[in-house]
Amino acid sequence: MAIVNEQILELLKNDQEYYAGVGKNYLSNSDIGTLLNNPKEFGVPREDNKAFMEGRYFHQLILEPEKAKDIKYVDASTRTTKIYKEFCEENNLPFCLLQKEVEDIQNLVGIINGNIAFFEELYKKGNQYEIPAVGEIQGMMWKGKADIVTDDSIIDLKTTSDIDKFKWNAKKYNYDSQCYIYQMLFGKPLVFYVIDKTTGVLGIFRPTEEFIKSGEDKVGRAIEVFNKYFGPNPTDDIENYYIDEYLF
């Protein structure tokens, strides 16, 4: 893991800097899917939406409860109601959560904190929360921000709509490349702590060497695409991009 300027790491603790400031100088796991599936979208800012906001609030309740207190939400049945639109306008918000959505997330966190095994691991003495790291991987500079850094692992919190399918869908959502990138940046294996949003069932998912190798290969392919279209010496124009595959 490369030695980096402590000032950069301090800046990256701030979400604004991480996503829109100095953090833009680095690739991240969120770029993997874009580069491999639709590189024309690389670098295009993504608007906040329900999924992003729910995920952020879920993480804040567990990792940064002081920030969670600042969330603005409205007691409305849908986002098409007058009360919702007026609330967003009065608070200068492009989007906000509904009270029932906030309560659902609070219930999920209550289930997690009510499980002894989860609680002891998530809040173990010495754990560090929301820790950024940067480093060189396969010739490119990458960033990552760990939910929880323990003595011997990185814990990443996830929600899922179907925990029975989590291990089958993990590569689809690029959790394999996340495991590889974070292990390279932090020098520790990444473990997923997961809760099913529908049933409340909890699960712990640990990556195998094969899973991490899949992530390593995926990172290599993403770097090839980046260099082809966006590197210092690109060999093609992104406007020429198209998909060329065989059907089986």
State where each predicted segment sits.
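Polybasic (Lys/Arg-rich)
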Residues: V219-F248
